[in-house]
């Protein structure tokens, strides 16, 4: 019963904070919020230039392999379980999927900067 109360209070408080975070900025809108800020100087060029897709791909690749490390770090503790074959199979499948994704990105020349 206490666990349900704690979880429900956390959900309610989180929902209230999210709603307030979305609602408050809309109350005080003025044109200076939409203008780019460049260290107090007038902007040299438009701040709304298109973003290079290469940076985005590198960031996504970093996040994927960061996730892989986060999922593989608990394996030494998971080896102490009774069903070690299932755990090792799951880890092997995870690494295989990520390796296939890396090979595909490499084949599509997503990791090359020169064009």
From Swiss-Prot:
GO terms for cellular component: mitochondrial inner membrane; NADH dehydrogenase complex. The keyword ATP-binding does not apply. Coiled coil: none annotated. Its main location: mitochondrion. Its EC number is 7.1.1.2. It is found in: Mitochondrion inner membrane. It comes from Scotinomys teguina. It catalyses: a ubiquinone + NADH + 5 H(+)(in) = a ubiquinol + NAD(+) + 4 H(+)(out). The chain crosses the membrane at residues 3-23, 55-75, 84-104. This is NADH-ubiquinone oxidoreductase chain 3. Core subunit of the mitochondrial membrane respiratory chain NADH dehydrogenase (Complex I) which catalyzes electron transfer from NADH through the respiratory chain, using ubiquinone as an electron acceptor. Essential for the catalytic activity of complex I.
């Amino acid at each position: 019963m206490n666990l349900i109360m704690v979880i429900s209070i956390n959900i309610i408080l989180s929902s209230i904070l999210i709603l307030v975070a979305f609602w408050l900025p809309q109350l005080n809108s003025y044109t200076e919020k939409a203008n780019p800020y460049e260290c107090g100087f007038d902007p040299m060029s438009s701040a709304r230039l298109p973003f290079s897709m290469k940076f985005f791909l590198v960031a996504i690749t970093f996040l994927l392999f960061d996730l892989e490390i986060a999922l593989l770090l608990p394996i030494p503790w998971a080896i102490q379980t009774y069903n070690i074959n299932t755990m090792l199979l799951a880890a092997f499948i995870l690494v295989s999927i990520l390796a296939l994704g890396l090979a595909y990105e490499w084949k599509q020349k997503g990791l090359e900067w020169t064009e």
